[in-house]
Each structure stands twice: as structure tokens, then as C-alpha cells.
């Protein structure tokens, strides 16, 4: 099956698993997905993730995080899509819910949060927004 937007697929898997109250999900692996999941873990939105190299195709297991039975991620959405890319300069990077949420940006210095990109003085492609 040809997947045109693997990042949107990953975000949809997370959203669907949390609405079904699943503890763990598996998905195909890529460097960009691992970078996004690393940021989600650092920001406290997921418990953990690890790569499973045992399969023919490498996959990632993600352990989702809940607080009092409610998902920690209230909304997760893709901003830049294959049909309509969204690039922002360092001055145009959004502040999500006045700093309570996080926007993930792909820059020339790697994948980082909008706060880190603003401090580093770089802009880039706005991948997704998480609250």
C-alpha cells in the first residue's frame, strides 16, 4: 500500500488509539517519525517509544500516556501537508495556546519545537500542532 503522508498516518494512529483507550500502538518506522516521537516524549505527551528491529520492516512501539483515565494529548493535528506545505520564518512561528501546547517544526538544524527554533533563530516547515 502506498502511503502519501506517513506523518499524518502516525498522528491519526495516535489519535485513534487514545480515543479507544489503548496503552500501546505499533507503526512503521522512519527517521522523521522517531524525531517527532522524541519531542513528544520530552514534552511529556507520550510515556515512551522504542524501535522493534525484529520484523522485516522496522516498526516503532509507542506507549501512550494517560492522566486520571484521560489522554494527555487533547488534540494533535497535521499543519503542513504534501499538497500544501506550510513554511514559517522564526518570527511567524505560532505560540500554541500561549505556550501550553507545542508546534513541531522541521528546520535546517533538525526537528524541534517552535520554542527551540525561535531561540535558535531558524524557521522551517510547520509539521504539526499538539495540545
From Swiss-Prot:
**Single Gene Ontology BP term?**
translation
Q: Summarize subunit and interaction data from the UniProt record for this chain.
A: Part of the 30S ribosomal subunit. Contacts proteins S5 and S12.
Task: Name the PROSITE patterns for this protein.
Answer: RIBOSOMAL_S8
Family named by the database record: Belongs to the universal ribosomal protein uS8 family.
Keywords tagged on the record: Ribonucleoprotein, Ribosomal protein, RNA-binding, rRNA-binding
Question: Record keywords: rRNA-binding included?
Answer: yes
Q: Which GO terms describe its molecular function?
A: rRNA binding; structural constituent of ribosome
Question: Signal peptide span per the entry?
Answer: none
Describe the function of this protein: One of the primary rRNA binding proteins, it binds directly to 16S rRNA central domain where it helps coordinate assembly of the platform of the 30S subunit.
Provenance organism: Nitrosomonas europaea (strain ATCC 19718 / CIP 103999 / KCTC 2705 / NBRC 14298)
Give yes or no: UniProt keyword Chaperone.
no
GO cellular component annotations of the record: ribonucleoprotein complex; ribosome
Name-wise, this protein is Small ribosomal subunit protein uS8
Q: Cross-referenced Pfam families, in alphabetical order?
A: Ribosomal_S8 (PF00410)
Give the gene that encodes this protein: rpsH
